[in-house]
Amino acid sequence: MTESLVLSPAPAKPKRVKASRRSASHPTYSEMIAAAIRAEKSRGGSSRQSIQKYIKSHYKVGHNADLQIKLSIRRLLAAGVLKQTKGVGASGSFRLAKSDKAKRSPGKKKKAVRRSTSPKKAARPRKARSPAKKPKATARKARKKSRASPKKAKKPKTVKAKSRKASKAKKVKRSKPRAKSGARKSPKKK
């Protein structure tokens, strides 16, 4: 009886081995997509349809190739291997993203430049324009600070608080001149 129990799992193991013997007659879809984009060399990128045509004409793929291509395009977009030039999702046009070395070196330079310029811009408006004309200076400050705030990481809280006060002050000051300007305009038209 114990022998019959041992024999039943033995035939199940070879079935698993048979399932792993499958071999594809083509490279991976991601490799085929990259080859299709390289071969097309279009300025605006390659569309999904043109990629599908290229793959079907150059490789032996199954009947579900369109679905596999669409899914692998999405994966490549998420991984950053492809860059989408037009459209949304798997539709549109695609290019191969530039190599990591090319991306990293300009990225570091840009960050360094941003850090050096943002404190200078923030320091100048506070010192130079605060003693100047009050109503115009507050409007200019609020605009410039709101532009500079996304670049800064350390001081956005103080900038936001001041810009809110300035925007409230703007509304009060603007409402009075608008009423006057409206009264002035109506006699001119008549």
Swiss-Prot record:
Keywords: Chromosome, DNA condensation, DNA-binding, Nucleus, Phosphoprotein. SUPFAM superfamilies: Winged helix' DNA-binding domain. One of its GO terms (molecular function) is double-stranded DNA binding. The keyword Phosphoprotein applies. It holds the Pfam family Linker_histone. The modification Phosphoserine is found at S23, S30, S146, S167. Residues 1-29, 87-190 are annotated as: Disordered. It is found in: Nucleus; Chromosome. Erythroid cells. One of its GO terms (biological process) is nucleosome assembly. Residues 25-98 form the H15 domain. The keyword S-adenosyl-L-methionine does not apply. Residues 13-24, 104-190 have a biased composition (Basic residues). InterPro entries: H1/H5, Histone_H1/H5_H15, WH-like_DNA-bd_sf, WH_DNA-bd_sf. SMART domains: H15. Belongs to the histone H1/H5 family. Histone H5 performs the same function as H1, being necessary for the condensation of nucleosome chains into higher order structures, and replaces histone H1 in certain cells. This is Histone H5.
